[in-house]
Each structure stands twice: as structure tokens, then as C-alpha cells.
Amino acid sequence: GCLLLWLLPSVLRAQSSEEARPRSMPCQQSPAKVSCKGVGLRKFPKELGQGVKYLELSNNFIQNLSGSYLPGFGQLEYLDMCFNQLEAVSATTLAQLPRLRSLLLGSNHLDRNYYANGQAFRLLRNIEVLDLSANNLESHMAGWYISNLTRLRVLDLSRNKMTRLPVGIFWSTPRLRELDLSNNYIMEIEEGAFEALELLEVVNLALNSLHCISGFSLTQLRVLNLSHNALELFVSEEGAEPYLLQVLDLSHNRLLYFPELPKAHYLTHLNLSNNLIASLLPGSHHPGEFVLRYTEMARFNRTLHTAAGLTHVADLDLSNNRLQLFPFTFFHSLGSLQSLSLAMNCLQDIARESLTDGMEPSDHLPMPLEHATLSVRSLDLHSNAIHVLPRWFFDYLPQLETIDLGSNSLQPCESQGSDRGGNLGEGSHVPAPGGTCTPFYNVPRLKHLSLCKNNITRLQPYAFNQTSLLSLDLSGNKGLFMPKEALGGLELSLQKLSLRGNQMDNSKAELPCLDTLKVLDLSGNNLSLLPTGLFCSPLESLDVRNNNLLTLEKLALVSWSHSLKDVSIAGNPFSCCSLAWLDT
């Protein structure tokens, strides 16, 4: 016992000296950059040394940035304190960061001491990038925080509790170029709220509660996101100055009509998906269809000129609306259109309107070819109710390379081919019986075609002759019968083929020798043997999952020994006694 008492002072001295010794920081550090992300810090690390310019302190438990002497941080330019528990920032601390350019404070509690914090922010004279997202800030709080940041260029106020943008909220930030206000509760933007922001180029107002945008006057904007609001009306200001807007996202709103953008000559990307647009034809406007009443409806005038100024639009998304017709005249005014989506609408017929708004039979040309030819290269029409595409349809799309017609009810027509290259003689087109099938032959520029889930039960001979397809999707057509001649004409072009989920047995899946086929999906069928036509194809990827295969023919594997890179075989009743092919 005496010995233990004699040793106790020595033990205590050793312990105290160990506690006094500074602990090594669990941070990644270089001369100018330090990252202490997610290391459990509860206070600002003062002992990081001189010359640090980049400091990352996100995902910690720091509550205060106040009353601290910060030696060595006079050179700091970038500070990230997102995802902490920060609620207090003092002027004393910020005064020691004269070179700070970027301050990221997202996902903290800056609503709690906003007035004192906002006063401290007045010392951030050189700040250019500020993130105040997800801090439970109301409109007046956000305005107070930025009330003296005259050099600010990028501001993130997303995921807060702002309900309005009052006049003057941005008067002190005239150099602002990018502004994120998404995921708030903004219902009102007072006239003149953005008036001071003459350099503003990018605005994100997605996921708010806006009902109407009228007199839109931000002519200098390049990118505007208004998706996921409750907009029924979007009307730009009728001024002489053109808009510089290039990207406009109005998706997931309640728009009843195509927005009026007469001066948006530089617009290249327009997203109108997930709205309530039922027609693109002139004269379809009826004010009573609006849920709310707007004084702007009196001058809302729908004509063919609605899209006349959109000469640079290359990408237009109208998917998931209520369109019933495909109006060629409307899209013709979009002279630069490359990608068009009308997926998930109510299309049953391709619009048969003439230039005089009359209706003509679908098997006749609806108007002179030069008045309606589209420049579209990619067209998405999946998930509609289209039964037939008239024979002139592809003539009006001479640049078309990709078309998705999945989940419709189209039946390809037969075309008679003579040679392996797919040449058609004059008059060889087989007429569509009663206009019930769609001619996919002789479309020379078409490269990618999807006809999945079209209830196709029989593929006619030479259905794609003189159409040099690179990829063809025929999946989801249960019970499909495909004779050997069905893909005649594709021997020298087809590289990717999907016959997935067709429940085809051996007698229904005959393939010609496809000299360029690299990717083949035969999964979800009832095959016990592979089609022999495949053996001459230079396959790189083969999917035969969920069939009735007992083995893979050795002849096929030998043929593919130098090309095959991956094969999927799960879900087949392979015999364990005949797996020698695995060694091939």
C-alpha cells in the first residue's frame, strides 16, 4: 500500500503533462489549404498556422464564430462552415478576415441571432460568394444579411422560409450575377425587386409558390429556372429591347398555353414539361380555363406568332402535357430545333392542319413541304396513343436521326427488299392496308428507333429496309413473331438490338446474318436455342437472362471468342453436366 501511495504523484504528473501537450489536429493540411470536414470540431481551430487561404470546416458541431482572436488567418479567402450548428457570428471575428471572398454557411441556425449577425456581416466588404441556404431565414432576415455586401456576385438563399421579394431587398448587391432562391415559399415578387441587379445572369426560383409571371423584364438574364411552381401564366414585357435569355425552365407548373416570348431571340433550351398545355394551335385560348383571374389576360393573345421569335431554340421539352395533335406549322417556326419531346401526352393523330387551319385526311400532305419541314434530329413520342404515322411524316423530318415511339400502338408496314444491302426498286413499297400500319422503310437518316411496348405481334418482312438503323428496340412486345426477313436490309448497319421481354420461343425469333451487331438483349424470352443467324455477328455484349437455355452452342462461342466482352446468363436451367462451354 505504501508503494502505491509513493508512486501516485509520479502517475498524476505524467497524466497532467500528457493533457497539456497539444493534440494533433485530425485535418488534412497543406501550406495554403486545410480540410477539417467531419472531424467532430466544436469550436473554430485557431492553431492551424500562418498562410492558410482555403479552410473547410463543414459537417462539424461549431456553434459560435464570435469573440475569437484568429492569428494567422489574415490571408483566408475561402471558408466553408456548412452543416454545423452555427448561430452566432461576431464583428470581431469577421474583421480579422479582410481577404475573405467566399463564405459558405449553408445548413446552420443563422435565424437565431440574425440582427447581430447581420451587423457583423457589414464587415465582409470583399465577399463575392455567399451561401446562406437552409438557415430558416425569412424574407426580412435574408435582406438584412445582405444589406451591405456591395461586391457580392453569387448568392445562395435556397431552402429557407422566404415568402416574398420586396422592393429594395437587393439594392445593396448591384454586382450580383447568380442568385438561387429555390425551395422557399415565395408567392410574391414586388415590381422592381430585381431592378438594381443589372448584371444578373442566372436566377433559380424553382420550388416556390408563384402563380403568375407578367411583365417579365429581366432582359439581361441568361438562365431562369421557374420549375415546380404553380404558374398558370407567363408573359414577357412588350419592350423594344431583346432578351438575352438562353435557358428557361417552366416545367412542373400549371401552364395552359405556350408562354409568350416575342423577344427571346437567343433562347436555346425551353422546358415546358409537366404542365397542362392542351393545344399549340392559334385561337385556342379561353380565359375561363384559368384557375385564378389575372388582369394580364386581357392582352394575352395566342396566335401563330407565339413561337415566331424563338429562332434559336434547339431543345424543346413538352412532355407530360395534354397535347392531342402534333402541329407541324407551329414547330416549323422554330428553325433551329434539334431535340423535341412530346412524350407522355395524349397524341392520337399527327396534326393534319393546313396553313389555313383546315383539316385534311392524314394520308395526304397537310401543307406544302417547304412550309412545314422540321430540322429536328431527336424526337421523343413515347407513351402516347398513336396508332399510325402517315407516310408523309418522315418526309417532313428529313434530318431525323433518333425517334422514341415506345408505349404506343404502331404496327410497321411491310416493304419488299431484293438484295442484302437493302435496295428498293421503284414501286416496291407495299401500300398500307387501310392506313393501319406505319412505313419505317426508306428513312435514310434514321439511326435509332424504339418501338418497345407497341403490342406488335408480327414484324413484317423488310420492315426497315433502306433505313440504316444503328439501334433498334423491339422489347416489351409480348408474343412477337419475327421471321428471318423482318430485319432484312439491316445486315450492314445494325449494331444494337433489344428483344427483351417478348416471351418469344425458338420458332418466333429468326435473325438474318447481322454483320455489324455488337449488343444483343434477348432476356425475358422462352428460348432454348440461340438464333443461328447470330453466329456471324461480332457480338461484344449478350444478355440471355431468364430464358430456357440448357447450354450455349459451342459454335456460337467460338465465333464470338475474339469479340464477346460480357454475357449475362442468370435465370436459365443450365445443366451442370454440360457446362464445358464455359471453358471456351
Name each region found by the language model.
Residues N108-G118, H211, R222, E232-L233, ...:
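Leucine-rich repeat domain C-terminal region
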